Amino acid sequence: MDYKTQFAESLSNIFTNELTQQQILDLIETPKQDEFGDAAFPCFSLAKQYKKSPAIIAKEVAEKLSDPFFTKVEAVGPYVNVFFNRDTVSDAVLKTILAEKEEYGKNYFGCEKTVVIDYSSPNIAKPFSMGHLRSTMIGNSLKHIAEKCGYEVVGINYIGDWGTQFGKLITAYKKWGNEAVVKEDPIRELFKLYVQFHEEVKDDEELEEEGRAWFKKLEEGDEEAVELWNWFRHESLKEFSRIYELLGVEFTNFQGEAFYNNLMEDFIGILEEHDLLEESEGALVVNLEEEGMPPCLIRKSDGATIYATRDLTAALYRQNTFGFDKALYVVGPEQSLHFNQFFTVLKKLGYTWVDGMEHVPFGFILKDGKKMSTRKGRVILLEEVLEEAIELAKQNIEEKNPNLKQKEEVAKQVGAGAVIFHDLKNERMHNIEFSLENMLKFEGETGPYVQYTHARACSILRKESVEFETCTFALKDDHSWSVVKLLNKFPQVIEIAFNKNEPSVISKYVLDVAQSFNKYYGNVRILEESEEKDSRLALVYAVTVVLKEGLRLLGVEAPEEM
């Protein structure tokens, strides 16, 4: 039940000509203080039309407004404030959640539509660092949120398995690498070689040329180059899979950049057919001067392709394969120009589906105020952070609940959840200063706090069993009402998170629910025998449903015991 819509309907019967119901709904506010009611309508916009002060309009509207849904209507200055019938709303909200369970909050505006989400996309032969966490977890959450809105979701891990860096890595391996040493710890050793290349190239410019030459060989199918590339890729994917399992992240496919190698010439042909290619200093470009951007480089002067060519080819392939209505690219803000160019080239080709494509940037994880960089070796490995978080969770369990069953599994859920939630509680465009201490806190605005609240609610339900199907629910006290109002917002919160591509909307919401429930738990005798006992237990159950589902949308698990 959307009680704001009910309020808007009642007001639309008064403002039959002045405002539409949607306009009224858009104006309705939620008062910050409970004494001003559950919803408020500001009358400022009507002053000119009525030729009266907003306060007088509010008073007249309050006198006309009558609905059994409201227990009280009052004019306070320029606002019409209403108080909803708590019995009616709590009964409707709780019955809806009890009936729908984990389906509660589902929206259907995405039904029969497809969204492609491109996220995570680590580079082969480089360690999976904390810097990869944001794209991975934001994309994973957006995938769950889109599914909750009815979309068919294609989650693509566009692995960075092609490009000039492989020429550099092959050069470094052939100069300084040792096969036996690399086999012992492939990712770390290959990463060391990559960093060494960037150090050595400062004093030896010829290394850059060697790197370019090896990448050209790789593009031409040179046997040795391809064999080394396949080895680097295989070892990297093994490590990535282990980390994705720890994070609980899954993808529809791992079609990386190399997948499109044999399709790029066809796309370049399409650009030629549309007369969009120009030669510039031996390279092929699409001129974007009219759009106020530098030219989009399609092929370098040495004949090598560039990632823009692959991204353009991939976009057309994905549209032809999946027929997407939306396509999200969860990639850092440093790629903004690239995406502007990329989308503009597709528009120049006349593809209308580009209107559904969107770059979803995010802030950096900083270390000592600086962006982490794989070239300079300033890297904190995600796997090490996850392992430390899980170990800390184990220690907490041993101290607080040593007899807990499935300690290892719960520690994994809580430790990984702490890292994921820390990332997603921040608005995605905000930078995050890396701090292991803050990330692993198990109190305050953290994942473990929400998980513990869920476990606490589950423990109450284990003490009592109720046949909710036969109940009518009525909750009048302020603490229960605060929780009910929050639970009622869940579908709307999910829609907002989807429209904004913003998982932090969900994070903030589950924190609010957890905090409100804990106040309820501390002030209401839930298990005390009374006519409201079944209603109170129904509210506890509804909280477990919403917290578990809210955490799932973030990619965080909800243990029933901690």
Curated annotation (Swiss-Prot):
Family: Belongs to the class-I aminoacyl-tRNA synthetase family.
The name this protein goes by in its record: Arginine--tRNA ligase 2
Organism from which the protein derives: Bacillus anthracis
Family annotation (Pfam families): Arg_tRNA_synt_N (PF03485), DALR_1 (PF05746), tRNA-synt_1d (PF00750)
Superkingdom classification of source: Bacteria
Keywords, sorted A to Z: Aminoacyl-tRNA synthetase, ATP-binding, Cytoplasm, Ligase, Nucleotide-binding, Protein biosynthesis
Cellular-component GO terms for this entry: cytoplasm
EC number: 6.1.1.19
UniProt KW DNA repair keyword: no
Catalysed reaction equations from the record: tRNA(Arg) + L-arginine + ATP = L-arginyl-tRNA(Arg) + AMP + diphosphate
HAMAP family given in the database record: Arg_tRNA_synth
GO molecular function, one term: arginine-tRNA ligase activity
Assembly notes: Monomer.
